[in-house]
């Protein structure tokens, strides 16, 4: 199998963390309230601006929505035990690596630093004030389309084509990467969901874990 780059999702792929809800929990805020805000936004009961204001308010209410505290949270989150060795083995073979996540830019940067990956893209940009307090964020609702745009930026920056790459992920927002590369490796989540039919159909391979990905791309 010939390829020049591998594009990884983060949540549920390189890490067991579900970053949005786990971040809320780590701050000490109500996960139930977070889920209600997201539900109301998804069902269009509230606008994007209203959902953002409510979620930022929820996080700020803990008194812990501050850059240094958030960085400690992200530093402490676990990686899949296979991830460091997998990334190391790809780097030794001069395979380029890119992280594209629907999560936060601060978290994506942290994972990139821990794994030694310089190319990373995130769907959510945190906005801090001069004192490091989290004030807002920018978020793109259509994560699959946004991931594809970010993938295209990576290709341009790396002088690659989509078919030079493998894509590894575990959720619906990876579907456009699977379609673009034609070689999407789908990691089955621990708990089944009702929104995975499309991504399963688009996948080139289905695997139970990151360890199985390691076996495929480093035979």
Predicted regions span which residues?
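Active-site neighborhood of HAD-like aspartate-dependent phosphohydrolases
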Residues: 1-49, 53
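Glycine-rich phosphate-binding "P-loop"
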Residues: 63-77, 134-142
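Short, acidic loop-to-helix structural element flanking the phosphoryl-transfer center
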Residues: 68-105
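Surface-exposed amphipathic alpha-helices with a cationic face
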Residues: 84-92, 147-148, 152-159, 179
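Acidic, Mg2+-coordinating phosphoryl-transfer loop and its flanking beta/alpha structural elements
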Residues: 101-102, 162-208
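Substrate-recognition "cap/lid" segment bordering the active-site pocket of phosphatases
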Residues: 109-165
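Short acidic-hydrophobic, aromatic-tinged amphipathic segments that line or gate anion-handling sites
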Residues: 120-121, 204-213
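Short, charged, surface-exposed secondary-structure boundary motifs
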Residues: 128-135, 194-204, 216-219
